[in-house]
Design a protein with these regions (language model features):
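Conserved, mostly hydrophobic/aromatic
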Residues: 34, 152, 279, 323, ...
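Polysaccharide-binding surfaces and accessory modules of carbohydrate-active proteins
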Residues: 23-31, 35-38, 45-254, 270
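Bacterial N-terminal signal peptides that target proteins for export
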Residues: 1-8
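Short, structured beta-strand/loop micro-motifs enriched in basic residues and often containing a Trp
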Residues: 259-270
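Aromatic-lined carbohydrate-binding/catalytic grooves of carbohydrate-active enzymes
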Residues: 314-378
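Terminal connector regions
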Residues: 290-320, 327
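Hydrophobic h-region of N-terminal signal peptides that target proteins for export
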Residues: 10-19
């Protein structure tokens, strides 16, 4: 009897050991054709290990010890909240009843399922047992386009209202020896000016507070070249991201004391406090990522492929084409200029000609942007 009991205990122990060593039990693997995003459920937290080249077996990350000291931080988390030992800017900051700001999210479960051909969704469920705040991290992997889209869903499971202060769509920790950030800015008549800069310790922020005028001065996108200080279209590791949001946004790039880059992307917290009632859920905008080791050009093509195949309505339809007079003529109009442009439109097979800013009067001519607007004569 004693021998049988010992054999039973040994079998149970072996089963527990196998369970613990099976990567599928603790690792959350989000994959495309050429890239992997790897998270791990460990000791109640969800640790972010990797976003980059495809990794077939995540077991290499198992038991990986933190390079941080206990007195100044924790491992990089998939969705860090204000509270506990996390000291960088948090993805989630909540003001709870009684002006209590501590939120500590614990791992509950995760599951993955196919959405459509070549598209897989992974949901990671977190909860703060003290406040009953629930967070679902959603990752949509587009296999053929090498694109992963992230957003978060925040639910108030408590009995009273809470106030969301930070509620970013995505937190992305990156580890490299050097970070070259490329982004786009501009103004009227000079949009999308490209700027590249090597990031240093501290915080670099790209944001707008102008409401729906989001891309006029700063564009909610970036290209991050790793382990280099020079731009290259054709080779090198690159992470590119674009936020699908037309309101106030912020992209935050923080290099901490361990030279890890922490990227937060989402709605700008400035003047955006949101009261979430009992049982209500707030869904953040989507953050679109792609990774490649074939340079910035391939990252751009990945995003364009995704937009054509999934992001744009009826993208397979050939759209009508028009010619707008503004860039060709500006204020310098006469009958011959207009008719010549119309004839050229016809010869090129375009469907429409638009006479832009064309209210030109005789008595009060429209010769510049400060006069004559609306004084149209047939």
């Amino acid at each position: 009897m004693k021998k049988q009991w010992l054999m039973t205990l040994a079998a149970i122990s072996a089963a527990i050991t196998l369970y613990a060593e099976n990567p599928s039990d603790t690792f959350i693997c989000i994959e495309t054709e050429k890239s992997s995003m790897i998270l791990e459920a460990r000791e109640g937290e969800v640790i972010f290990h990797h976003y980059g080249s495809k990794i077939g077996n995540p077991a290499q990350f198992k038991g990986l010890k933190s390079y941080r000291r206990a007195d100044y931080g924790t491992d990089p988390q998939a969705y860090p909240a204000t509270g506990g030992r996390y000291f960088n800017e948090a993805a989630l900051t909540i003001e709870h009843p009684g002006s209590q700001w501590n939120t500590e999210l614990e791992y509950i479960s995760h599951h993955s399922y196919g959405v459509s051909d070549g598209v897989t969704r992974t949901c990671v469920f977190l909860e703060d047992p003290m406040t009953a705040v629930k967070v679902c991290l959603v990752y949509d992997a587009y296999k053929n386009e090498d694109v992963i889209i992230c957003h978060s869903e925040i639910t108030n499971g408590g009995k009273k209202d809470i106030i969301l202060r930070n509620f970013y769509s995505s937190s992305l920790p990156v580890k490299a020896g050097r970070y070259l950030l490329t982004h786009f800015h501009g103004s009227w008549a000079r949009e999308m000016q490209m700027t590249s800069e090597v990031l240093t310790n501290g915080i670099k922020t790209i944001e707008t507070r102008k409401g729906v005028r989001t891309t006029h001065t700063e564009n909610p996108s970036f290209i991050l070249s790793l382990d280099t200080d020079s731009w290259n279209e054709n080779y090198g590791e690159v992470i590119a991201g674009a936020l699908a949001w037309s309101g106030n946004y912020r992209l935050s790039f923080q290099i901490d004391e361990t030279d890890r880059l922490n990227i937060l992307s989402g709605i700008n917290p400035h003047a955006s406090a949101y009261t979430l009632g009992k049982g209500e859920t707030f869904v953040t905008p989507e953050m679109i990522y792609t990774y490649t080791d074939e340079g910035a050009g391939q990252a751009s093509r990945n995003l364009h492929d995704w937009a054509r195949n999934h992001g744009c309505y009826d993208s397979s339809i050939t759209c009508p084409t028009l010619l707008n007079s503004w860039e060709g003529a500006y204020f310098d109009f006469d009958t011959r200029t207009i008719t010549d442009m119309i004839d050229d439109v016809k010869d090129m097979g375009l469907e429409m000609f638009v006479l832009d800013d064309g209210w030109f009067g005789t008595e009060y001519p429209r010769n510049n942007s400060r006069q004559g607007l609306g004084d149209w004569e047939p």
